[in-house]
């Protein structure tokens, strides 16, 4: 086990701003967009999926760099700090094993088939980037979770960010190997707060993927459950592909106990994962026998001293799950 875990930079562990401090009332609402190629074509048919697969050659993947981490945003008006307690009644959704257990390799501690690497093109600068993501069990069996900044560049002062292009998810990527193939994105969803204002407390996204050769991603790899409104102090396992560990070529893990990120709503853990692990899941109750847990956070930021942060999973995260989880 690698005891470590990104990502977006923040000034310090105690620097977080309450989620609703001076932000638009709809910051916890969500927006969706169809996935596109670099030329703007929607990924709506086999021909576009084929073009997407041809784009991500081994050479291009090797040259991709960890996703740009969100920089500091303009100061927001002060607001009373939010307490550390849950914001509502805790809830969970179940994890799901793959349909055919024989398709999984023998599990290794802290390596999960339901966690993988993401590659995409940033339309602003034309660069190729990488993040992490995780399959999550939903009615569609086609959804993965990641960070908001892995699907959208994030807005500034109400000017909306740009949706990423050529987006693919590779379950249990390992040194170029794609044991479950490459899943093309079909539709993204993230919070208004991230898309329009770059609100790091809403740096969460969910992505519907296309089936691959008739297999939905959760059926192929299994999918984690979802937890929300739990205490900010939890034993968690963080999984992802940090660029400062084996150049992001292997799945790494960090295990420890989370804490509240200063006076703000986010949670934090000392993991020291570098860029590339953005979007990796923070899991409660990871079962090493099947590599599945209950997702209660997503890798978002890093601050001084190796502290990593995740948005707090609350009722709006569950609402995002409900809104996107049945899309096929």
Features from the language model and the residues they span:
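Chymotrypsin/trypsin-fold serine protease catalytic domain
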Residues: 185, 200-270
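Conserved catalytic-core segment of clan PA serine endopeptidases
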Residues: 98-129, 136-137, 158-215
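Secretory targeting and sorting signals
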Residues: 1-22
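Protease-domain processing segments flanking chymotrypsin-fold serine proteases, especially trypsin-like
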Residues: 15-137
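Acidic glycine-/aspartate-rich tracts in secreted/extracellular proteins
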Residues: 149-152, 173-176, 211-214, 243-244, ...
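Terminal peptide-recognition signature
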Residues: 57, 118, 133, 146, ...
């Amino acid at each position: 086990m690698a005891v470590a875990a990104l990502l977006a930079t923040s000034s310090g562990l105690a620097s977080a701003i309450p989620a609703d401090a001076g932000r638009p009332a709809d910051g916890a609402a969500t927006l969706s967009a169809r996935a596109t190629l670099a030329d703007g074509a929607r990924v709506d048919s086999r021909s576009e999926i084929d073009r997407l697969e041809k784009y991500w050659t081994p050479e291009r993947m090797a040259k991709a760099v960890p996703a740009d981490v969100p920089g500091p945003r303009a100061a927001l008006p002060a607001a009373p700090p939010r307490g550390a307690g849950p914001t509502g009644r805790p809830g969970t959704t179940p994890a799901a094993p793959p349909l055919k257990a024989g398709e999984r390799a023998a599990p290794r501690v802290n390596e999960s088939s339901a966690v993988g690497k993401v590659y995409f093109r940033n339309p602003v600068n034309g660069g190729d980037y990488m993040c992490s993501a995780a399959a999550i069990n939903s009615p569609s069996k086609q959804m993965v979770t990641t960070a908001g900044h892995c699907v959208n560049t994030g807005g500034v002062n109400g000017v909306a960010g740009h949706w990423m292009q050529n987006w693919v998810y590779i379950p249990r990527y390992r040194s170029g190997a794609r044991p479950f193939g490459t899943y093309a994105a079909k539709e993204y969803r993230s919070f208004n707060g991230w898309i329009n204002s770059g609100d790091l407390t809403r740096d969460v996204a969910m992505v519907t993927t296309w089936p691959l050769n008739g297999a939905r991603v959760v059926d192929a790899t299994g999918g984690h459950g979802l937890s929300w409104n739990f205490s900010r102090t939890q034993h968690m396992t963080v999984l992802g592909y940090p660029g400062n560990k084996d150049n992001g070529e292997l799945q790494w893990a960090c295990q420890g106990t989370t804490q509240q990120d200063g006076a703000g709503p986010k949670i934090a853990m000392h993991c020291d994962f570098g860029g590339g692990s953005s979007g990796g899941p923070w899991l409660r109750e990871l079962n090493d026998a099947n590599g599945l847990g209950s997702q209660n956070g997503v890798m978002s930021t890093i601050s001084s001293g190796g502290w990593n942060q995740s948005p707090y999973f609350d009722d709006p995260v569950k609402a995002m799950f409900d809104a996107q989880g049945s899309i096929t």
